[in-house]
Amino acid sequence: MRSPKILLSPKAEQDIIEIGGHIALDNAHRAQSFIGELQDFLVMLAENPMIGRTRPELARGLRSIPFVGYKYSIYYRVIRGRTGITIERILHGARDVGRLF
């Protein structure tokens, strides 16, 4: 069985850079830990892409799931045939998500 694909949109890549940088201001080790935990979470999500809730009020085909243990949510789309996911954004819960999609 092939591993599912995990694609990052340019905005998601930028989100990760900004989140990691923000965490690193206080604790560089914690920032590295965050990135590792995020990678593990994304693998789990790609293997189980339907576990997130649908978000039709934001965009067609969009789903979201909270990143457990953090105040962030992951917004993603399932690749046709459920062969993987495209991460659209990773956003803090305090953000006005409706304005960002």
List PLM regions with ranges.
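Enriched for short, Lys/Arg-rich terminal
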Residues: 67-101
